[in-house]
């Protein structure tokens, strides 16, 4: 299982448009690449059906059927901790800790051997320090330490994971 996890680093007290739009942009990526979508530290909803309804009703990004397909397949998760079955945590960052840095080649191996959760921080601040420390690996997607806008990073990371998985299947 591969989990694409959006980490709320914006406001935790009030739902903002950026929350909904980021989720709306992640849904088609998860649908296309057969990932689960986890939302970490999003206290605005009681259940995932509320999330899907709010995203579908508020945004015009993507085909709503993708969200409902993920929902019906139990592939959207509201979490405030990381269940063991989500596997290894992989922080996405332009500044990986050298000791935790995960190369593309290593990613191919890791995702073919076990479940993984890729953490994507929303906003300029990136992932909180505690999650960076908890993550088993750090993945830098550009190969050059370039900081990307959040939704651009989501697309790059999702596509990179997909290609790593395809390569792993062929080995």
Predicted regions mapped to residue ranges:
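Secondary-structure boundary/capping motif
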Residues: 14-15, 47-48, 99-100, 127, ...
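Residue-level signal for well-ordered alpha-helical segments
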Residues: 7, 12-14, 116, 130, ...
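Short secondary-structure transition/capping segments
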Residues: 49-53, 103-104, 152
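Well-ordered, non-membrane alpha-helical segments in soluble/globular domains
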Residues: 19-25, 104-108, 154
């Amino acid at each position: 299982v591969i989990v694409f996890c959006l980490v709320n680093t914006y406001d935790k007290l009030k739902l903002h448009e950026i929350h909904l739009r980021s989720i709306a942009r992640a849904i088609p990526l998860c649908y296309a690449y057969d990932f689960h979508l986890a939302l970490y530290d999003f206290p605005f909803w009681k259940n995932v059906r509320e999330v899907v309804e709010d995203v579908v009703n508020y945004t015009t990004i993507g085909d709503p059927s993708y969200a409902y397909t993920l929902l019906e397949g139990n592939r959207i998760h509201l979490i405030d901790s990381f269940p063991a079955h989500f596997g290894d945590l992989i922080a996405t960052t332009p500044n990986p800790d050298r000791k935790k840095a995960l190369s593309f080649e290593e990613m191919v191996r890791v995702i073919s051997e076990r479940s993984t959760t890729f953490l994507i921080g929303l906003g300029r601040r990136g992932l909180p320090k505690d999650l960076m420390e908890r993550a088993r690996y750090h993945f830098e997607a550009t190969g050059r330490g370039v900081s990307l806008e959040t939704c651009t990073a989501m697309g790059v990371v999702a596509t990179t994971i997909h290609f790593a998985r395809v390569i792993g299947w062929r080995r």
